[in-house]
Regions:
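Bacterial N-terminal signal peptides that target proteins for export
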Residues: 3-14
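Sec-dependent N-terminal signal peptides
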Residues: 13-22
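Hydrophobic alpha-helical membrane segments
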Residues: 26-127
Length: 127
């Protein structure tokens, strides 16, 4: 599979995850759903930037889990990692009820900081 087809496939998987997670958020407020969507979008950008790291040998990934996964399973580990991370984030947020907006806001802030940092050092999202 070519890199462009892989990215297209992973985008479709993320869109499906967004839709499924938002459908199952029956007891969630509009704010909760919006924060989850923002988190998913930021994680998608972070995933694409992380994939860009492995196309440029002058960069390196700071996350040891992703590095070990790529070393053992190849570049397809990156999207799998982010899909699992998003799923885990949804499962945790679903259990938090009153703390949900705080949790989702915190994870969004962390993801935004990573995306901004990656952008500043020159990583692209491959669009």
């Amino acid at each position: 599979m070519t890199p462009k087809k892989e990215v297209y496939l992973y985008r479709k998987i993320f869109i499906m995850l967004f839709c499924l997670s938002l459908i199952s958020c029956a007891g969630w407020t509009k704010t909760d759903k919006t924060l989850l969507t923002i988190n998913g979008a930021l994680m998608t950008v972070d995933m694409l930037q992380t994939m860009d790291i492995y196309r440029h040998p002058e960069y390196y990934e700071l996350n040891p889990v992703i590095n070990a996964g790529v070393k053992n399973f190849g570049n397809n580990f990156v999207p799998a990692y982010f899909v699992m991370s998003f799923g885990l984030q949804y499962l945790v947020a679903d259990q938090l009820d009153s703390w949900r907006p705080w949790f989702l806001s915190g994870t969004a802030a962390g993801s935004l900081a990573l995306v901004i940092h990656n952008n500043e050092i020159g990583l692209s999202v491959g669009f």
